[in-house]
Amino acid sequence: LIIGILTSLFCSIFITRLLIEGVVNKWGKISFSRKWSENLMGNAHFDFLGKSKISYIVMIVVLAVSCVSFAVRGLNMGAEFTGGRAYVIRFDRPVQAEEVRMKLQDVFSGYEDAANVSFEVKQYGNENQMRIVTQYKYDDTSDEATSEVDRILYDALHGLYGYPITFENFRNTQNDINGILTADKIGPSIAKDMTWGAIWSVLFSLIAIGLYISLRFKKWQYATGATTALAFNALVVIGVFSLCYGWLPFNLEVNQAFIAAILTIIGYTINDTVVVFDRIREYLVLYPKRDLRENVNNALNATLSRTINTSGTTLVTLLAILFFGGETIRGFIFALALGVVVGTLSTLFVATPIAYGLMKREGLGKK
């Protein structure tokens, strides 16, 4: 993300300028729109603040449904947060993570107590090494349970080798360089530490962004609106994962990738919110005699085109990956796509109305 941001900044400042200057020098003029899109959303006059009561009701209902689902169904927690076993397995040829995942799924589905157990497959180092994390019998630390998991892995993966590897050689690399290189148990204490680490990372990001907004706009009302909207976004995504896991045709597991998605959503959404708040601050300076409500509504309408275009292009890319990408990243991409949609709506109907309401209560807006 950092590399992408820096690259985009460099291209916007230098490359785009050179291209525009080249076009202008050659043809004398340049157009940034078509006739059909020239005034698209340019003269919008939506009364966003007039719908604030409705938006608050919808927000409360959505949060209530999310909380009920979380209390009743819970979340499909990954092995990082519940405990489990982590393996690094070496093959004698390059293999794909999706290929390994499909083999594991076929074998695990044949075990009655393992049919709904989630597992994670990632390339580890070389193309012929995979890291596999499974929750199967995570609460059983006996040697018998470990041997059973080893046997399941062998049954699933021995066909991917170019020679008939035995179960003993698969478990022990002293006689064969291929097979299980490392096998670790993720105990309850480690899982608990990782759970709290994930929670603190999200809370810290919200606090840091709240402080940044307070310092940038010098009004706590903006920070309150922004952080409330960000927390709402995170809770809605978590609620949808709780409500929909087991119903959608792909895995909605809450793992470290999901936490990364939540943090990405928080960072992405705040961009839209800052753009709107910047325009509100600008209008308050340019039109100090206008009513605060009018300035805020005008700011929302003025930035609406930018908000929709930015979110729309991002969403198109995410949907393409969601539908045509690999199974292992669909849960992560689904969380991002959902976060983009919810984040856009929360900027318009949560963050700004809350900031406006607090500013109005304090008698601000005409300074």
Regions found by a protein language model. Give the residues of each.
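A structural signal for conserved, well-ordered secondary-structure elements
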Residues: L1-K367
